[in-house]
Amino acid sequence: MSASSSSTNPMSREDATTLLPSVQDKYGGVMTEMTHPMDPSLFSTLLRSSLSTWTLQGKKGVWIKLPKQLIGLAETAVKEGFWFHHAEKDYLMLVYWIPKEDDTLPANASHRVGIGAFVINHNKEVLVVQEKTGRFQGQGIWKFPTGVVNEGEDIHDGSVREVKEETGVDTEFDQILAFRQTHKAFFGKSDLFFVCMLKPLSLEINAQESEIEAAQWMPWEEYINQPFVQNYELLRYMTDICSAKTNGDYEGFTPLRVSAPDQQGNLYYNTRDLHSRN
């Protein structure tokens, strides 16, 4: 595959006038990041020359990053065989595969990550909301606070943030209790939904006006007896798991900060069962 850049692509002084500027990536490919305006015909000439040179050099994937102000060059790249890989608010990434065999390029992001927050207080009341928008609006359904984890945000931090935004309640993350995977959920992408247990640090509710119709602390038994919960298989399993956790019969996954040579992340694991073996 071909992605992040590491070193400058060597070229002669003559090459520099006929090739697009590029850097080599870690996977035998090259990355070109366009930063200055260029006439499409000149861009086409340089791109063809570059592809010929990179082919002779045995390169594989070719990435072209176009900022939005240079989006007019995208048509030229597509005519040369490039295709869209992904886009962000300020750039478009295109890619081309030189070898004859099937490409091994990494796919665009395949999943969206969401959370559902199980927050229960000392009175065995669960924090629930009714939504102003979305699939459940206007149906009188009480549900856990839910939301999407932001780019670069840890799952546990996202769950705390979503609860605060939707209800005004401060919480402390406890554990991930379960997760669900579905496909073709959002613009054809798959979805990972993590059920998180959080401990309330405050009880006063201040519902988010833009998204939340109502919020309250609801007795747990009243919540699980809603027809919507009883008739929805996923929610029945979720409530069984949450009940088992509350009763001490179930252990979820706790985050452990871990590091690798070039990045940091979190390992979520069952601390109780692991420690019981030692």
UniProtKB/Swiss-Prot annotation:
Induction: By paraquat, drought and high salinity. InterPro entries: NUDIX_hydrolase-like_dom_sf (IPR015797), Nudix_hydrolase6-like (IPR003293), NUDIX_hydrolase_dom (IPR000086), Pre-Nudix (IPR040618). GO terms for biological process: response to oxidative stress. Expressed in roots, stems and leaves. Keywords: Hydrolase, Magnesium, Manganese, Metal-binding, NAD. One of its GO terms (molecular function) is ADP-ribose diphosphatase activity. The active site is at E165. It is an enzyme of class 3 (hydrolase). A motif (Nudix box) lies at residues 147-168. Its cofactor is Mg(2+); Mn(2+). It holds the Pfam family NUDIX. Mg(2+) binds at E162, E166. It catalyses: ADP-D-ribose + H2O = D-ribose 5-phosphate + AMP + 2 H(+); NAD(+) + H2O = beta-nicotinamide D-ribonucleotide + AMP + 2 H(+); NADH + H2O = reduced beta-nicotinamide D-ribonucleotide + AMP + 2 H(+). GO terms for cellular component: cytosol. Residues 110-242 form the Nudix hydrolase domain. Probably mediates the hydrolysis of some nucleoside diphosphate derivatives. In vitro, it can use both NADH and ADP-ribose as substrates; however the relevance of such substrates in vivo is unclear. Confers tolerance to oxidative stress. PANTHER family: NUDIX HYDROLASE 2, NUDIX HYDROLASE RELATED. Overexpression of NUTD2 confers enhanced tolerance to oxidative stress. This is Nudix hydrolase 2. It comes from Arabidopsis thaliana.
